[in-house]
C-alpha cells in the first residue's frame, strides 16, 4: 500500500489487494524444474496450463494447474529442424507454441514437439542491429509475441550505431513488409546508454495492439499503439520515490 499527504493536508491511501493461491504438485514421473524462467500460460473454460521451458531436458513442460499433472514434450536438438537453447516462448494454444532460440530463429511447435513453421529473424535484422529477446529479470525482459489477429510475430531490436530501440513486426504469410515501431526514449534519461551498463535495455511486453515498455533506471511506463500510433506515458513518481 502507498500512503501520502497532499499539499492541502488530506491523506491519500492507495492499497493494492492481491489474491494468491498456492498449488502443490505431487511427485511426478517426469523430471521438472523448481522454477521456469521461460514460461507462458494457457487459460480457457476447461484449460488452465502453464507451459515452461525445461533447459535441463530441452523440453516443454505442460503443468496442468487443475489436475496437477506434468507432461513433457521433447524439442528436437538435431536434424534440419533442430532447436537450440530457448530465448523466448509464447503460447498461442496447447497445440501452437512459438519459441525462439539462440540461433535467432522462431519455431512453431505442436503438442508433440513437431516443428510446423520456422522463421529466420536474421532476415529482418540490419547489419548493425541486434535482436533482444530476453527474459533475464536481473537485466531486462523483452518477450517474443505472436499477434493472432494480425498473424504476426513481434520482437525488440536495437541499432548498435544510433542506440535506438525498435519493435519489429514480421507477418507470417509475408504478404506485408516488416513493420517497424520506434520506441520513445526515456523522458527522464534520454540517453540510457551512458553509464547504466546492462540496465540500459527496456522491458517490453505486449497487450493486443499495444506495446508496453519501461526503462529499468526509471519508473515511467510508456505505451505505443501499433494501429493508431498513439503514444502515452505515465510518470510513476510519488511523494516518497523520485522517478529515478
Feature names for model-found ranges:
Residues 69-103, 119-133:
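Blade-loop segments of beta-propeller domains
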Residues 35-44, 88-92, 136-149, 198-207:
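Structural signature of eukaryotic scaffold interfaces centered on beta-propeller domains
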Residues 9-36:
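A short helix->beta-strand "capping" segment at the edge of beta-propeller domains
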Residues 26-58:
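Beta-strand-rich domains and repeat architectures in extracellular enzymes and scaffolds
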Residues 164-174, 223:
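Beta-propeller blade signature
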Residues 56-58, 105, 159-163, 218-219:
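Short glycine/acidic-enriched loop and turn motifs that connect beta-strands
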Residues 2-6:
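Bacterial signal peptide processing site
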Residues 104, 111-149, 156:
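Asp-box/WD-like beta-propeller blade repeats and closely related beta-sheet repeat scaffolds
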Amino acid at each position: 500500500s502507498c500512503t501520502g499527504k497532499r499539499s492541502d493536508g488530506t491523506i491519500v491511501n492507495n492499497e493494492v489487494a492481491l489474491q494468491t493461491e498456492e498449488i502443490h504438485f505431487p511427485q511426478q514421473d517426469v523430471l521438472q524444474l523448481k522454477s521456469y524462467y521461460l514460461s507462458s500460460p494457457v487459460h480457457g473454460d476447461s484449460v488452465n496450463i502453464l507451459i515452461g521451458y525445461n533447459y535441463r531436458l530441452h523440453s516443454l513442460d505442460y503443468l496442468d494447474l487443475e489436475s496437477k499433472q506434468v507432461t513433457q514434450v521433447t524439442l528436437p536438438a538435431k536434424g534440419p529442424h533442430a532447436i537450440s537453447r530457448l530465448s523466448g516462448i509464447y503460447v498461442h494454444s496447447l497445440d501452437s507454441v512459438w519459441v525462439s532460440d539462440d540461433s535467432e530463429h522462431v519455431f512453431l511447435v505442436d503438442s508433440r514437439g513437431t516443428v510446423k513453421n520456422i522463421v529466420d529473424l536474421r532476415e529482418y535484422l540490419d547489419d548493425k542491429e541486434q535482436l533482444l529477446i530476453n527474459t533475464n529479470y536481473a537485466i531486462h525482459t523483452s518477450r517474443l509475441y505472436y499477434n493472432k489477429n494480425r498473424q504476426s510475430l513481434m520482437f525488440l531490436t536495437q541499432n548498435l550505431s544510433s542506440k535506438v530501440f525498435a519493435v519489429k513486426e514480421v507477418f507470417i504469410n509475408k504478404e506485408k513488409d516488416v513493420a517497424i515501431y520506434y520506441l520513445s526514449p526515456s523522458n527522464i534519461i534520454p540517453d540510457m546508454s551512458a553509464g547504466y551498463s546492462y540496465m540500459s535495455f527496456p522491458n517490453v511486453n505486449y497487450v493486443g495492439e499495444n506495446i508496453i515498455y519501461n526503462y529499468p533506471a526509471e519508473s515511467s511506463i510508456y505505451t505505443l499503439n501499433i494501429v493508431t500510433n498513439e503514444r502515452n506515458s505515465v510518470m510513476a513518481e510519488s511523494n516518497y520515490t523520485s522517478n529515478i
